[in-house]
Amino acid sequence: MSDDWDDEPIVDTRGARGGDWSDDEDTAKSFSGEAEGDGVGGSGGEGGGYQGGNRDVFGRIGGGRGGGAGGYRGGNRDGGGFHGGRREGERDFRGGEGGFRGGQGGSRGGQGGSRGGQGGFRGGEGGFRGRLYENEDAKELPPIPSSCDKDEVGAFIDQLDLSKYTTSLALIRKLRDYLLTAFKALVNQAWASLEKLAQEKRAQKAHQIRETTDMMNRLMEDMGRLIREGEHEEANGIGMGFQSIDADCRADLSQWRNLQQVVMPQSSEIRDGQTNRTSGTEGGRSGGLTDGDDLTEIQSAAYAVYHQVLDRGYQTGRRLYDDNQGALREDSIPTEDREHPENNQVDGSTYGVTRFLHWLSENFVTRHEIRAVRFGSPHMVFQSYDWPESPKQHISTVHQKGIFYSQPLIRTRIIATVASEPNNSSSGQLSSMVNLARHQRSQNQETPDGIYVSRYNATGDEETPCSATGVPGRVVALRASSTPNEHRSDPGLSFIPNLTYEDGTIPSLAAGGAASTPLAPSLPAEHSLGLEMDSNTLVVPADADETRLVGHPGSTVVRSRLGGPPASTPLLSFRPRLPVIDEEHHLRFTRVSRELQMSVAFPPEETTLSEQREWGSIFRPRDEMVNYAEGPPPRQTQRARRRSRTRRRRNRIASAASPQLTPERIVRREEAFQSSRHIAATFMSSLLQNAAGEVTTSSGLAVTRSVKEITTSVHITRNVLQEEVPPTTEATTTSLEVAQATGYSDSGACMQSAAFSQDLPVVAPLEISGNASSDQASFDQALALLPPINSTPIGQHPIAVFGPKTEIEIKPQKMDISNMMNTSVPPMPMEVDEVPLEVSNTLANMSDHAYVTDIQILPSLQLNSLNLVSTNITDNAVNIAPSTSTNDLQTPSDRRTSMQNQLYRVSMNDLAYISQHANVVRLMVDRQEELGAQVSSLGPFKENSQGALNFSTMPAVKVYDPRIIQNIQKDKMRVVHGLFGALIRQSQVDMHNAPFIRNRKDALMAYRFLLELKTANIISLSSDGRFFGLL
């Protein structure tokens, strides 16, 4: 009986007030009604037993079950409630005369619930009152419905009168418990039935899916077998299955003519000459085959049956359960003859297919949706296609004409050669050769495994003008693609994969393509523009509408392999994102694809080319690198000395300092920057000249001057007192100077020509005091670190180019001729103005027998703070004046010591940094014009009250090599990251408690950054260096 009450609701009334059952007083007390029990409850007679339960030990109260007696079964004190049961005709749980706890009959139990119809229970506030039949107005609740049937539940609701149970809170609770108990079983029963139904549906659907899968697997196996059989069949281009059908048709021809079975549905509209096969009677077959019909009709019928079954059955089988669980939809059956009337090629009756396990009957048709053949042309069903990987061509006797459904790719490679026609253009015109390999590439990717060509090329058949400039050539049709990934874009530059083999041939790609021819001879290393080119550098002609560089007629001839009609998009409608810096693009090709950017906003006629520059001379190939190890000087060619003549001393008129910059000098400066000379060599030479010119000699004489005086030219004249020098000495030194000056002019190390040197008097070497014992090994090592730079002499007179000099006359004493012949002094740079020269001087490739005849103080380079490398040197300029000792002559050891001191004053750390980060210099040189335009757009540089320059900021990626940041030390990156993170998160940072400082090295790096930030007035730093924060 206890199982019947397991699902009863639990009412918690542990918070009851007053009259609680005291277990200490009546722990095992027994109470009985009219018939006393023995502690377990009376079981006979009219009485009901009640056994008191202990609340602490969770005792249960067993009620008597005697005939007619009111049984009461107590529940767990803590977990369950009292469930009072009332038998008909008997009293409730409490006896009429006695109450529990003191005669008033108030059971103040905190948890019990009474099921009796008459006894009221106050669960939360009190117990049963000590009055018999307290709730006489309580009525019987209707019976619980046995099922969820609509009629039963409706009857239950009609019998339930809710108005009778709203008079007190106890009745409402009683009604709630009853309804929960009543409908809980109904809900569980309905849920179980739903789960059972869903399980059955899932099992049925799984069974149907398995059947469909098996059927489709069988169909795919048949199709695969037919395909495999057709791969090795070359007789008629069809498989063995069709041959077997042909054999069956020949054997059972009479059977096919008299076939009565309906095997395939036909549309309602039947063309003339065809038989209505839907009647199913013999009379409907009057228009069938006759004895004179040819067997080709049977063969064509077999073709139609196979293609319809394989194509339609496979496609509809995969949609079997997508639409109406595989059932046939009447509206899904198209009228094939109405849409594609040419597909219905069956004249006569159809027949069964022995390849399948079943006949094509009405049952088979109803299980599939009939769809039209998915081909653009019905003739494509019967075409035989060549396998791409097959080297041989299949023979088809049915249809000999092949179908090419893909556009063949045209592979083209062009090699530019110099035309035989003479160059008759004016000096203002430039060559139409455009270095496409360097000007039309993208900076973001490397050179792809292929080439880019123009569409204005040539074929081998027709000779038409190539462009408006009159360049003879031929047109070529390229594939409509600018990149390998965009096959439908408008062609501007066509991507050509690497199709050129080592023997210089290009394989034929299209069907029936022309045979390849060997490549044309390569271009010479130097042409009219002075651009260095090799055999792999592509040159294309420029159109007059596409660029402002107008070429002369007949300048170049561009040849190609295959071609067609020319395209319409101009060549220069594509603009690269960044100029290309590819030092060894001609040494190797990679397979990285190239991305081009098309400019839509600008018309082609407004497009101009970027400035041409000799990148090949700046970045030399590896095999042309010069060994910097110092060796013996090159032997000078023997020249015939002519008889020297005695010259009189001639005083030069002292003139003013170098004039200010004029428009002509500014033009010369721009030409020097934009000339075809060696830009990187000039930069390095200028750096070394600044370093060498700002060196303080070790002599005791020094002239202090201000910064403004340094900017003016200070020269030393070449005048020597004639009366103090014997004629023999003068003649000897003059001839020696002439020979040496000529040699220097050839090598580019000296700035004066031989003819000009002959007209100048001989100057004695300056005396520079120093220690005679010099470190020869250190001097040689310093010389070896200096890179050699090839240069060419200036063809103009120095005074005419750079203006007159200021005369400072020095009169040395008599020279020793024997020492003069044995001297070995590397010469100093002679005459340098602030204008960037076209000639570059270096100290590493000069001869040993040269005289320092002229010294000029070098001012700082005016690069608007873009030359980051030479900034430190120019800012720390010192006042220099040559030593003017006139007491003693300079010995060879003194001169070597002086030169050694000069070389050691050059910052070797800066030179090492430049050599390690050559890409930075290359990037700065390449983007000099762009960076200058950005800086000039921010406004001119003006000096503030302190005399410092106002600098502007720009992205560091434009002036720095990103690899410097990528290859940064991990510890430095961690310290910088932690430092800036602390500055952002905290208003004030304590260095003693900084988590990113682990050792002294971290603290050193952190304080270095802190001092830089403090100098830039970004942070505030305490006097002891412990606390810092953002301003």
Curated annotation (Swiss-Prot):
Record region (5 X 7 AA tandem repeats of [FS]-R-G-G-[EQ]-G-G): 93-127
Free-text disruption phenotype from the record: Premature loss of centromere cohesion and high non-disjunction of both homologous and sister chromatids at meiosis I and II.
Keywords, in A-Z order: Centromere, Chromosome, Developmental protein, Differentiation, Meiosis, Phosphoprotein, Repeat
Gly residues composition bias: residue spans: 38-52, 60-83, 96-129, 281-290
Acidic residues compositional bias, start-end: 1-10
Modified-residue entries (Phosphothreonine), positions: T27
UniProt protein name: Sister chromatid cohesion protein solo
Start and end residues of each stretch annotated as Disordered: 1-129, 264-291, 323-348, 623-661
Bias (Basic residues): 638-652
Tissue specificity remark: Expressed in spermatocytes.
Compartment list: Chromosome, Centromere
UniProt function note: Isoform solo and SMC1 function as partners in mediating sister chromatid and centromere cohesion in meiosis. Not required for sister chromatid arm cohesion or for mitotic chromatid segregation.
One GO CC annotation: chromosome, centromeric region
Spans of repeat Sequence: 93-99, 100-106, 107-113, 114-120, 121-127
Species of the source: Drosophila melanogaster
Predominant location: nucleus
Keyword Cell cycle among UniProt keywords: no
GO process terms (BP): cell differentiation; meiotic cell cycle; meiotic sister chromatid cohesion, centromeric
Residues carrying Phosphoserine: S22
UniProt biased composition (Basic and acidic residues): 85-95, 328-342
